[in-house]
C-alpha cells in the first residue's frame, strides 16, 4: 500500500500544481485585459483634447442625422444656372413660330454641319494601268457618291429647323431615315440601269 499511497500523493501534487498554475494564469490574464483597456482610454483622450457634452450626442447618430443640427448659410441661388426640362412641343407649333424665336431656341454646343468643305483629303495616287472597264466602274461609283452629296446639300435652310425637331420624336426620325434609304436605293437602281 505504500507504493499505492505514493502514487496518490504524486497525482494530487500534480493536480494541485496544475490548478495553482491555471489560477495564476487567469489572474494575470484579467490584470492584462484591465491594463490594456486603461491604456486605450488614455490614448484616445490626450491631455489637450476634452470632448464637449454636445459631441457625444452627435457621435451617436450618423452623419446625415447631424446635418439637421448645423445652421445653414443663406445660399445665393442666382449663381447657379437653372436646369429645366425642355417642354414637349409638336413640330407644327414650331413651324408656325416666327424666325426670331427659332434662333433663340437653337442653342448648339457642337456643330452638326456635315458639309465636305472643311474636310480636305490628300488625293489618291492614280494607277495608270487601269483598264477601260475599271475606269468606267470608278466613274460610275464617283457619280453615285456625287449624287448622294448633292442630295444632302440640296436641303433648303428652312428644313433644318424641321429636321432638328424630328429628333424629338423617334418614330418620325426612324420613318424619315427609312424613307431616305429607300429613295437612295431606288436612285442607285435607276442609275445602274
Curated annotation (Swiss-Prot):
Residues 119-128 have a biased composition (Basic residues). The chain crosses the membrane at residues 11-31. The keyword Glycosyltransferase does not apply. Phosphorylated on tyrosines upon TCR activation. Residues 32-193 are cytoplasmic. The modification Phosphoserine is found at residue 46. Its main location: membrane. Keywords: Adaptive immunity, Cell membrane, Disulfide bond, Immunity, Membrane, Phosphoprotein, Signal-anchor, Transmembrane, Transmembrane helix. It is a single-pass type III membrane protein. Residues 129-145 have a biased composition (Basic and acidic residues). GO terms for biological process: adaptive immune response; negative regulation of receptor recycling; positive regulation of T cell receptor signaling pathway. Residues 116-166 are annotated as: Disordered. Stabilizes the TCR (T-cell antigen receptor)/CD3 complex at the surface of T-cells. This is T-cell receptor-associated transmembrane adapter 1.
Amino acid at each position: 500500500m505504500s507504493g499505492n499511497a505514493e502514487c496518490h500523493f504524486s497525482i494530487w501534487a500534480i493536480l494541485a500544481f496544475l490548478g495553482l498554475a491555471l489560477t495564476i494564469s487567469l489572474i494575470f490574464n484579467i490584470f492584462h485585459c484591465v491594463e490594456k483597456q486603461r491604456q486605450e482610454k488614455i490614448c484616445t483622450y490626450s491631455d489637450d483634447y476634452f470632448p464637449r457634452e454636445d459631441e457625444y450626442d452627435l457621435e451617436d447618430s450618423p452623419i446625415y442625422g447631424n446635418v439637421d443640427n448645423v445652421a445653414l448659410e443663406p445660399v445665393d441661388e442666382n449663381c447657379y444656372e437653372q436646369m429645366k426640362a425642355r417642354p414637349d412641343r409638336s413640330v407644327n407649333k414650331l413651324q408656325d413660330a416666327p424666325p426670331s424665336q427659332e434662333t433663340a431656341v437653337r442653342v448648339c454646343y457642337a456643330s452638326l454641319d456635315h458639309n465636305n468643305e472643311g474636310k480636305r483629303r490628300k488625293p489618291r495616287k492614280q494607277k495608270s494601268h487601269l483598264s477601260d472597264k475599271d475606269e468606267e466602274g470608278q466613274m460610275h461609283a464617283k457619280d453615285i457618291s456625287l449624287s448622294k452629296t448633292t442630295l444632302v446639300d440640296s436641303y433648303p435652310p428652312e428644313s433644318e429647323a424641321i429636321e432638328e425637331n424630328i429628333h424629338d420624336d423617334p418614330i418620325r426620325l426612324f420613318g424619315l431615315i427609312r424613307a431616305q434609304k429607300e429613295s437612295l436605293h431606288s436612285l442607285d437602281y435607276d442609275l445602274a440601269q
